[in-house]
């Protein structure tokens, strides 16, 4: 495994660890999720280029489309929660709270 793949896998693991550690704030969770998506995009692009799969060049583009949709929905949810509650805590999303 080349060193760039190891670095990208470490970036993915660091983003996942950040997602687990900073899961109380929505903004931190969204940033870690974007880091995970970016490392998945780079890794899939490098894999496709190294293996020379000519039929699967659209997979990284599809991954970017899903990442953009996830970012837009996440930011809309962040704005909604911060407008309603004044904080970006994920526990504010619990509908069973009184």
UniProtKB/Swiss-Prot annotation:
InterPro entries: NADH_UbQ_OxRdtase_chain4L/K, NUOK/Mnh_C1-like
The UniProt record lists the keyword Iron: no
GO process annotations (BP): ATP synthesis coupled electron transport
Topology term for the membrane: Multi-pass membrane protein
Transmembrane segments: 2-22, 29-49, 61-81
Alphabetized GO MF terms: NADH dehydrogenase (ubiquinone) activity
Alphabetized Pfam families for the sequence: Oxidored_q2
Record's keyword terms, sorted: Electron transport, Membrane, Mitochondrion, Mitochondrion inner membrane, NAD, Respiratory chain, Translocase, Transmembrane, Transmembrane helix, Transport, Ubiquinone
Location of this chain's protein in the cell: Mitochondrion inner membrane
Top EC category: translocase
Catalysis performed (reactions): a ubiquinone + NADH + 5 H(+)(in) = a ubiquinol + NAD(+) + 4 H(+)(out)
Cellular component terms (Gene Ontology): mitochondrial inner membrane; respiratory chain complex I
EC identifiers of the protein: 7.1.1.2
Family the UniProt entry places it in: Belongs to the complex I subunit 4L family.
UniProt subunit comment: Core subunit of respiratory chain NADH dehydrogenase (Complex I) which is composed of 45 different subunits.
Function per UniProt: Core subunit of the mitochondrial membrane respiratory chain NADH dehydrogenase (Complex I) which catalyzes electron transfer from NADH through the respiratory chain, using ubiquinone as an electron acceptor. Part of the enzyme membrane arm which is embedded in the lipid bilayer and involved in proton translocation.
Alphabetical list of PANTHER family matching this protein: NADH-UBIQUINONE OXIDOREDUCTASE CHAIN 4L, NADH-UBIQUINONE OXIDOREDUCTASE SUBUNIT ND4L
Descriptive protein name: NADH-ubiquinone oxidoreductase chain 4L
Top-level taxonomy: Eukaryota, Metazoa, Chordata, Craniata, Vertebrata
């Amino acid at each position: 495994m080349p060193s760039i793949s190891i670095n990208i896998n470490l970036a993915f693991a660091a983003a996942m660890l950040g997602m687990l550690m900073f899961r109380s704030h929505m903004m931190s969770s969204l940033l870690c999720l974007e880091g995970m998506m970016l490392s998945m995009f780079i890794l899939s692009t490098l894999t496709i280029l190294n293996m020379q799969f000519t039929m699967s060049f659209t997979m990284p583009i599809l991954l970017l489309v899903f990442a953009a949709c996830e970012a837009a929905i996440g930011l809309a949810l962040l704005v909604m929660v911060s407008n309603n509650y004044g904080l970006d805590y994920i526990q504010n999303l619990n509908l069973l709270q009184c």
